[in-house]
Amino acid sequence: MDKLTHINQQGDAHMVDVSDKKITTREATAMAIVSMKQSTLELILSSSNTKGDVLVIARIAGIYAAKKCWDLIPLCHPLMLSKIMVELTPNEKNATIEIKTLVKLDGKTGVEMEALTAASVTALTIYDMCKSVDRFIKIGEIQLLEKKGGKSGHWKLENV
C-alpha cells in the first residue's frame, strides 16, 4: 500500500530523514506553458515592456526559485544544486511561451520540487511583468517531465 512520506505514523507532518540514503546524481525536468494575447507576446519579443526584458528576468527568477525551493515549501530539504537551467521558447503561432527547467545535483534526495518551482515561478514572473497589458494570461501544464537517479531510478512522462 502506498503511503505519504511526509506524514508519520501519528499523522503529523515531518521532513523525511534522508541520512541513510546514498549520494547519487539526481536530475529533474519540468515544464509550464504561459498563454497570452498575440500582442502581449509581440511586446515581449520586441523587448518593449516598461519593466524590462521579460524573458531575461523570468529566467533569473526561475533559477533563483529553484535555489530557494526549501524556503518556500516547508518540508523540502535545503540542497546544494549543481545545475539549474531555464529554457524559454516563444511560440508565435499559439501566442505561448513554453518553459522547460532542468535541475541537477549529487545528493541524497531528488530535485523534482526544485524543477517544478523553477517552472512555476518563471511563469508567474512572466505574468507579473505583463499583467498591465493582458489580464487574460493563463498559466498551465505545470508538470514533471522526467526524473533520474535515486531509489526509484529513471521516470519519464510519455509523449513529451
Swiss-Prot record:
Keywords associated with the record: Lyase, Molybdenum cofactor biosynthesis
Q: What is its EC number?
A: 4.6.1.17
The catalytic residues are: D128
- Residues that bind substrate, according to the entry? L75, C76, H77, M113, E114
Biological pathway: Cofactor biosynthesis; molybdopterin biosynthesis
Task: Provide the assembly information.
Answer: Homohexamer; trimer of dimers.
Its recorded name reads Cyclic pyranopterin monophosphate synthase
